[in-house]
């Protein structure tokens, strides 16, 4: 998707399906219709108030709404990589743009565009790590304290945590 937040109004795959070497074109809605499951969260986190994560489904491709630039909405399967790339260019997606928040501070302000209905205020979880009393004591006894605001957009606290899907087709044995 070229949009940060948008409803998918339609996806026309007909031109792509008729291109040389194309085996198929799948959309996020087809995955839902075929009851293909969602990607899972590898590490569920409890918020500091004890509640669980307020996270909805995480599909491999967006079925109805895109929530970040670059979110997949369709995939082309073809005999060669170049054929797949050419056919992908022929997929036509009609979007209805929705309001988006471009940074974390804007996303959590009252009245900000809501991205996930399961996460009020755009907060999936709110957590802390470490010992609050020991940290407070260290600051109180420090000779100098420096304050710095740092923004980590879409932070994943892992060295590598790809959200991906892969498929391999094997012809049935006869």
Q: Residue locations for each model-derived region?
A:
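Short, charged beta->alpha transition segments
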Residues: 54-64, 132-134, 153, 163
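Conserved beta-alpha junction segments in alpha/beta enzyme cores
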Residues: 134-174
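Charged, often Cys/His-bearing segments associated with DNA-binding zinc-finger transcription factors
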Residues: 125-133
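Flexible, low-hydrophobicity surface segments
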Residues: 1-126, 145-148
